[in-house]
Design a protein with these regions (language model features):
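Alpha-helical transmembrane segments of multi-pass membrane transport proteins
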Residues: 1-425
């Protein structure tokens, strides 16, 4: 165990890519330990990619890129603005709503921040919003991407923990709504304090017209969740249906998707999904060695000497994951901690669906935690703000998200009620 963990920490300290660190420490352990044949290392590496649910990752990524390239974002933002723009802080509310809807299409925080931010950041700045407030709100609202179904982190966690992906998708609905609502309340008071302008109230006829134009984007979450909950298709099959739907809408409804931009979409989707799949492949022998060395059991024994309270353990998990999420991206952090945390949660009676949503929400907040949050870098690139300025502006909405994290952590029914109601688990 010392050789295994020592090799992993050493590789991380010398800035080795996380995939190389995961595979490298497993290889060192197999070679030096001498108790595990190399064939086991190879079998677990390739075996990790044979899981049928993993096929949903590249398909959902492709669907999101097809819809984004197909030109849905302007119509989606226009609908959100018509619906909420007349409320105090309306542009901020429209940004949150647009992020929530796009989250159900992309399943990723950075993609949500880029797609919505490129439209809404200039609009808020033009309307007189403080640039820091606008950028910080967009960054935090982008965290809805991996929480509202569908969600790439939920798929990774579900496969790693052997938990129903459909249950995770359904369980993420209420936490996503709570986070969106909390950010809207925050934006309302910020707008009242700074007297931000409102858009003129639109008639219902105008709003319905914009809703009609955005209908393909609005219907996609219904298609995904409706098909899964009705038993029409599995989450993986839903991803395939979504790809076909996105391609048809982009080509024939929005008419911006053609053979010229398809290679760019395929290349981008291939690179994004390839990185995730390689990470998962390298994590499989890592998880196997973690289980073989009984590392989760050692941690459970140590924690049980301190406390056996699920609430205290959830607090420790939150603190650990918030710190881990600062230097590490969501996907690699998930494949490392899931094999360790799931047995710990099971030992104290924490529902695995609830634990999965808490883990994912924690790690997603790492994407907006200074100084190395990936979403912060993306928003800085779009807005032209310095990272230092955005790092200062991010704290108020970040603390709102922390409050939501506490609520989701200690009110488990927010994550488990819907799965039990509609899936019977």
């Amino acid at each position: 165990m010392i050789i295994f963990l020592g090799a992993f920490i050493l590789l991380l300290c010398i800035s080795t890519p996380i995939t190389v660190a995961l595979g490298g420490c497993s290889l060192v352990y197999a070679l030096v330990g001498g108790t595990v044949p190399i064939t086991t290392l190879i079998q677990t590496t390739f075996g990790g990619l044979t899981s049928f649910p993993l096929l949903a990752i590249p398909l959902f990524m492709l669907a999101g890129n097809l819809m984004n390239e197909g030109g849905l974002t302007p119509d989606l933002v226009n609908f959100a603005r018509h619906l909420l723009g007349h409320i105090r802080g309306g542009l901020g509310h429209a940004t949150i709503l647009a992020c929530a809807i796009f989250a159900a299409i992309s399943g990723a925080a950075v993609a949500t921040a880029v797609a919505i931010g490129v439209v809404m950041l200039p609009a808020m700045k033009k309307a007189g919003y403080d640039e820091g407030v606008a950028a910080a709100l967009t960054s935090t609202a982008a965290c809805l991407g991996p929480i509202i179904p569908h969600s790439i982190p939920f798929i990774i966690y579900g496969v790693s923990a052997n938990v129903s992906i459909a249950a995770l998708f359904v369980g993420g609905v209420f936490p996503g709504i709570v986070l969106a609502a909390a950010l809207m309340v925050y934006m309302y008071f910020v707008a009242a304090r700074h007297d931000y302008p409102r858009d003129p109230k639109k008639s219902w006829k105008e709003t319905l017209l914009t809703a009609g134009k955005a209908l393909p984007a609005l219907f996609m979450p219904v298609l995904i969740m409706g098909g899964i909950l009705s038993g029409m298709f599995t989450p993986t099959e839903a991803a395939g249906v979504t790809v076909v739907y996105s391609a048809v809408m982009g080509a024939f409804y929005y008419r911006q998707l053609n053979f010229k931009n398809l290679p760019k979409v395929f290349l981008k989707s291939g690179l994004e999904s390839g990185m995730v799949m390689l990470l998962i492949a390298m994590s499989e022998p890592f998880a196997w060695f973690v289980a073989a060395d009984q590392i989760p059991q050692l941690i459970i024994d140590w924690i049980s000497q301190v406390t056996t309270s699920p609430y205290a353990i959830l607090l420790l998990i939150n603190a650990f994951l918030l710190l881990l999420g600062i230097p590490m991206e969501t996907a690699p952090a998930l494949v490392i901690v899931t094999p360790i945390l799931v047995p710990i949660g099971a030992a104290v009676g924490i529902d695995p669906v609830h634990l999965g949503i808490v883990v994912c929400l924690n790690l997603v907040l790492g994407l907006i935690t200074p100084p190395v949050g990936a979403v912060l870098f993306a928003v800085c690139g779009m807005s032209g703000m310095t990272l230092d300025r955005l790092s200062k502006a991010i704290w108020p909405p970040f603390f709102v998200a922390l409050v939501v994290l506490a609520v989701v952590t200690y009110l488990p029914w927010l994550s488990t009620y819907l799965p039990r109601l509609v899936l019977g688990r």
